[in-house]
From Swiss-Prot:
The keyword Plastid applies. This is Photosystem I reaction center subunit VI, chloroplastic. Belongs to the psaH family. It is a single-pass membrane protein. Keywords: Chloroplast, Membrane, Photosynthesis, Photosystem I, Plastid, Thylakoid, Transmembrane. Pfam families: PSI_PsaH (PF03244). InterPro entries: PSI_PsaH. Possible role could be the docking of the LHC I antenna complex to the core complex. Its main location: plastid. Signal peptide: none annotated.
Length: 24
């Protein structure tokens, strides 16, 4: 869980967080 950082991480590291935060 990231909270508000998940949004920034998803935009910055879409390739890295794509596997962890694929809730979007």
């Amino acid at each position: 869980x990231y909270x508000d950082k998940s949004v920034y991480f998803d935009l910055e590291d879409k390739g890295n967080t794509x596997g962890q935060x694929x809730x979007y």
